[in-house]
Every structure is written in structure tokens, then in C-alpha cells.
């Protein structure tokens, strides 16, 4: 099963994240997170379990959308220094999620590797292209104009996607092509990334690593 559990604790944030890429049961050591979750929105149980509570509602919403449409089960709990601002929480949760994703993927054998998707949300349309390359790189262009969406700074949205790509060791190109509402622009971007990730991580039935180098 492609799954992982990661704890990442610093003086700024304390984070626990569990991921199962194929809706498999989440690692048992993450069960305690269920009792900590206070978010009512990003909390669903069933075949696909998604429980996210970062202390920032819109960030929970984005991680929920990412997991939902990528086909992941996900538990993510964070408490950070929000008394300062949202920077450390947004950045560090993305790092922890990227580490967990990389661990769950293993050596990347037997996956499609590349994925792309367009996703709309009403008037907004976003495109994401993913390469599970082992080489972290991110080009993010969302064109957000507001200072914040909810309690999440708009400047942190591209930064957290960059942080995720670095920790996961993957290449991301995420672009919002157009849209007049920043909530819609951001959410369509996360949904397009999710669908692209789902394609890139899909299994081909081969045992080979999809690279001429033989490793990723």
C-alpha cells in the first residue's frame, strides 16, 4: 500500500500528516488525529477519509480539494504560530505533506509519472502539469489580486505549492488561465493539480521506473 505517516515539529509548528494514495486504510499510528480535528468542513469519512485541520479555514479547504480529487485519503493536523501570521503554518504543512507523499510513493516504479489537467470553477479555469521527476521545480502563476482569501494570505498560496514540490521532489507547473474571483482561481488551481497528480501517480502495471536513467 502506498501510504505514509509523518510528524514534523519545530518551534513554529507541530504537524502530523498521514496519506494513502489509493484510498487505502490510513496508517494506524495516525488514528489519534481523529480526536484532535475540530474542523467541520474538511472532515469526511467513508471509503476515502479526509480530515484536515490547520487552524486556517481556507487552507483546510484547499487541502481537502487536493486530496478529494487526487483520490487520496488524508489526515493533516497542525497547530502553529498563527498569532504571528499564516506563513509558517502554510509553508510547513506543505513541506510535511510533500515529505509524506514522497515516502508513500517509494521508488516511483510502475507509475505513469506525467500528468496534466484543466479544471474550471465557474468563471475560473486552471491548468496543471506534473512530472514525478525527482527534481523539485515549480512554476506557479495564479494571478491572485486580493490580500487574503479567508485567513490565508494570497501570497502564501503559490509559496506553499512551491514548498510542496520541493519536499515531494516533483516538478509542478500550475497556472490559472483566467477568472475574476480569487477564491475560484485558487480552488480551480488546486483541483487541476489534484487531477494531474492522480494521473501521474496512476499505476501502469509495470515494475520499471519510468526514466531512461532507471531511477527517479
Curated annotation (Swiss-Prot):
Protein keywords: Amino-acid biosynthesis, Histidine biosynthesis, Lyase, Phosphoprotein
Example GO molecular function: imidazoleglycerol-phosphate dehydratase activity
GO cellular component: cytosol; nucleus
UniProt record, GO biological process: L-histidine biosynthetic process
E.C. numbers: 4.2.1.19
Catalyzed reactions per annotation: D-erythro-1-(imidazol-4-yl)glycerol 3-phosphate = 3-(imidazol-4-yl)-2-oxopropyl phosphate + H2O
Pfam families: IGPD (PF00475)
Alphabetized InterPro entries for the sequence: IGPD_sf, ImidazoleglycerolP_deHydtase, ImidazoleglycerP_deHydtase_CS, Ribosomal_Su5_D2-typ_SF
Similarity comment: Belongs to the imidazoleglycerol-phosphate dehydratase family.
HAMAP family with a match to the protein in the record: HisB
Full protein name: Imidazoleglycerol-phosphate dehydratase
Species per Swiss-Prot/TrEMBL record: Schizosaccharomyces pombe (strain 972 / ATCC 24843)
Amino acid at each position: 500500500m502506498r501510504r505514509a505517516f509523518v510528524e514534523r515539529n519545530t518551534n513554529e509548528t507541530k504537524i502530523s500528516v498521514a496519506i494513502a494514495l489509493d484510498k487505502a486504510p490510513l496508517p494506524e499510528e495516525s488514528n489519534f488525529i481523529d480526536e484532535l480535528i475540530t474542523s467541520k468542513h474538511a472532515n469526511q469519512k467513508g471509503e476515502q477519509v479526509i480530515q484536515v485541520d490547520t487552524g486556517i479555514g481556507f487552507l483546510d479547504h484547499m487541502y481537502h480539494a487536493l486530496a478529494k480529487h487526487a483520490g487520496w485519503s488524508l489526515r493533516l493536523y497542525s497547530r502553529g504560530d498563527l498569532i504571528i501570521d499564516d506563513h509558517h503554518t502554510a509553508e510547513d504543512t506543505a513541506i510535511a505533506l510533500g515529505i509524506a507523499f514522497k515516502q508513500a510513493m517509494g521508488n516511483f516504479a510502475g507509475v505513469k509519472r506525467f500528468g496534466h489537467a484543466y479544471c474550471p470553477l465557474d468563471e475560473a479555469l486552471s491548468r496543471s502539469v506534473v512530472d514525478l521527476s525527482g527534481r523539485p521545480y515549480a512554476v506557479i502563476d495564479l494571478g491572485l489580486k486580493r490580500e487574503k482569501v479567508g485567513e490565508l494570505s494570497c501570497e502564501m498560496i503559490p509559496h506553499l505549492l512551491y514548498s510542496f514540490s520541493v519536499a515531494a521532489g516533483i516538478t509542478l507547473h500550475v497556472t490559472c488561465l483566467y477568472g475574476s474571483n480569487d477564491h475560484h482561481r485558487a480552488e480551480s488551481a488546486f483541483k487541476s493539480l489534484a487531477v494531474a497528480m492522480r494521473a501521474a501517480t496512476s499505476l501502469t502495471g509495470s515494475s520499471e521506473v519510468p526514466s531512461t536513467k532507471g531511477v527517479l
